[in-house]
A protein has these predicted regions:
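Cell-envelope/extracellular polymer assembly enzymes that use nucleotide-activated donors
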Residues: 9-12, 40
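Acidic helix N-cap motif at the loop->helix transition within catalytic regions
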Residues: 22-26, 50-58, 105
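Short, acidic, metal-binding catalytic loop of nucleotide-sugar glycosyltransferases
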Residues: 29-38
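A conserved acidic beta->alpha catalytic loop
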Residues: 30, 45-54, 69
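Acidic donor-binding/catalytic loop of UDP-sugar-dependent glycosyltransferases
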Residues: 51, 98-113
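Long helical/loop segments within the catalytic core of UDP-sugar-dependent glycosyltransferases
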Residues: 66-86, 109, 113-179, 235, ...
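Catalytic donor/gating beta->alpha subdomain of glycosyltransferases that bind UDP-sugars
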Residues: 114, 121-147, 175-178, 183-245, ...
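Membrane-embedded multi-pass helical conduit in multi-pass membrane proteins
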Residues: 252-322
Length: 352
């Protein structure tokens, strides 16, 4: 179980939770059985209207925190994690989502890895669990594009200005977190994990980012509606050239389908040699998608995910343009989005 606060936790695990009754129990079961390091667990109940608070309170070693009213210009998550950090007593802070499940011993290993890498921020991209057509088709495409846009090797390189992190698993030293102002420094950002990594790296601290399927797994979305809302919030911020990327995805999809049709017609005609030539484009597309750590069946479905990815990119871009983005039952617009844009301009300058 989690080490009591009185014993001096090395790590404070902070979980913001808003209506997470479907996943919080599994998350806490995986965290309360961690071994090898003193730690505490704090769940910040961000105005849940379901059984989230009751589930958290059912774990004796878990502290449940109320973040208080949402200040003007703040996002709900940033307010919640700031409240958690204020109550935390650890030398390290692990911000993790309620829909994550942590491998046995992963907490101690993560802190050891951060120290071995001399990193003040360690972030893992979890193994993504996907079910059903929409998740299996769309998620591999998005994560392949993320791997291209934000290569972990460059983010972990102190000589590179590129920086990003995944808020599903973000371990940061208390020293670095407090030095840059914590989440209060990115209070208005809807992409707080990336923004926090940028300001921490810009302040001279080292970050390490990698695929972390050996440490943590998650299922981000459980319906197409959740998937659409979540990526609408994120994609335009992750990919500033969202319109161009959407057009390219549609072109790639059209090229793949055309090549498959030509290949099929040649096979029917008995011309296998030229049919194989037309399969080069679909093969290269699937191999690119395969960099995202999904199953081969999901990578193949990713071909059908290309136009859906384009739709989500355009929807995200339009939502930010009109100033209305919703997440977890809250509508963000006007000052919050404008402030987030200004924050992002200030931190992106000089980054590729």
């Amino acid at each position: 179980m989690g080490t009591p606060v009185s014993e001096g936790p090395t790590v404070s695990v902070i979980i913001p939770a808003r209506n997470e009754e479907a996943s919080l129990g599994a998350c806490l079961r995986s965290l309360t059985t961690q071994t090898g390091i003193p730690y505490e667990i704090l769940v910040v109940d961000d105005g849940s209207t379901d059984n989230t608070r009751a589930i958290a309170q059912s774990f004796a070693s878990v502290r449940v925190i109320d973040p208080g009213p949402l200040p003007e210009g703040w996002t709900g998550k940033n307010n919640a994690v700031t409240a958690g950090a204020h109550e935390a007593k650890g030398d390290w802070l692990l911000f993790t989502d309620a829909d994550t499940v942590h491998r046995p011993g992963s907490l101690a290993k993560a802190v050891a890895e951060a120290k071995q890498q001399k990193a003040d921020l360690l972030s893992y991209s979890p193994e993504q669990e996907v079910c059903g057509f929409w998740e299996r088709a769309v998620m591999p495409v998005i994560f392949a594009e993320l791997a291209r846009k934000y290569p972990p090797s460059r983010m972990s390189d102190p000589a590179s200005k590129l920086a990003a992190a995944n808020g599903q698993y973000l371990l940061v030293s208390r020293k670095a977190y407090d030095a840059v102002g914590g989440h209060a420094a990115v209070a208005s950002s809807l992409l707080e994990d990336v923004e926090l990594a940028r300001i921490i790296k810009a302040a001279g601290y080292r970050i390490t980012f990698r695929y972390g399927g050996d440490a943590v797994r998650t299922r981000m979305y459980r319906s197409f509606q959740q998937l659409r809302e979540g990526w609408t919030k994120n994609l335009a911020l992750l990919f500033p050239s969202a319109i161009a990327l959407a057009l390219w995805s549609l072109i790639e999809f059209a090229a793949v389908i055309a090549c498959l049709v030509f290949a099929a017609s040649l096979v029917i005609a008995g011309d296998w040699r030229h049919a194989l030539f037309y399969l080069i484009v679909p093969f290269l597309t699937v191999m690119r998608i395969a960099t995202s750590h999904f199953s081969w069946s999901s990578n193949l479905l990713g071909i059908l995910g290309l136009p859906i990815f384009a739709y989500l990119l355009l929807r995200s871009k339009l939502s930010y343009r009109i100033g209305k983005v919703s997440w977890k039952g809250r509508l963000y617009g006007g000052r919050t989005i404008a402030a987030g844009r200004l924050s992002r301009r200030g931190t992106v300058a000089g980054h590729s």
